[in-house]
């Protein structure tokens, strides 16, 4: 199996995993390992590519773009979850101690004696 074939198979496998389990806890770790393996395989490509290998590389690029879109959606979902948790946390703190976050806006100092 050529390096391009291995790269193609790994890319399709990772794309299928992202599509099948977008909320997986191990997705980030798996994707990181995939990127490391892909980088090593890409460094090993040193020969002239055949037409068939060029077509596979075009398919890899298209799949990579689709994975990037899916990962952006997942990232935005995670950001929204983090923001919701932070809002919930601040509301809970304000409820527990409503006089803590006193601001100094509108403070009037009387200079009369």
Swiss-Prot record:
Keywords noted in UniProt: Bacterial flagellum biogenesis, Chaperone, Cytoplasm
One GO BP: bacterial-type flagellum organization
Compartments reported by the entry: Cytoplasm, Cytosol
Major localisation: cytoplasm
Subunit and interaction comment: Homodimer.
Main function: May act as an export chaperone for the filament capping protein FliD.
Entry's family note: Belongs to the bacillales FliT family.
Entry protein name: Flagellar protein FliT
Species the sequence originates in: Bacillus pumilus (strain SAFR-032)
């Amino acid at each position: 199996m050529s390096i391009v074939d291995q790269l193609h198979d790994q890319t399709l496998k990772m794309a299928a995993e992202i599509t099948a389990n977008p909320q997986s806890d191990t997705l980030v770790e798996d994707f990181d390992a995939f990127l490391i393996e892909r980088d090593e395989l890409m460094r090993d490509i040193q020969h002239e590519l055949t037409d068939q290998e060029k077509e596979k590389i075009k398919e890899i690029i298209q799949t990579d773009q689709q994975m990037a879109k899916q990962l952006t959606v997942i990232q935005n979902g995670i950001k929204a979850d983090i923001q919701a948790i932070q809002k919930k946390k601040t509301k809970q703190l304000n409820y527990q101690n409503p006089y803590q976050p006193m601001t100094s806006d509108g403070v009037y100092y009387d200079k009369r004696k």
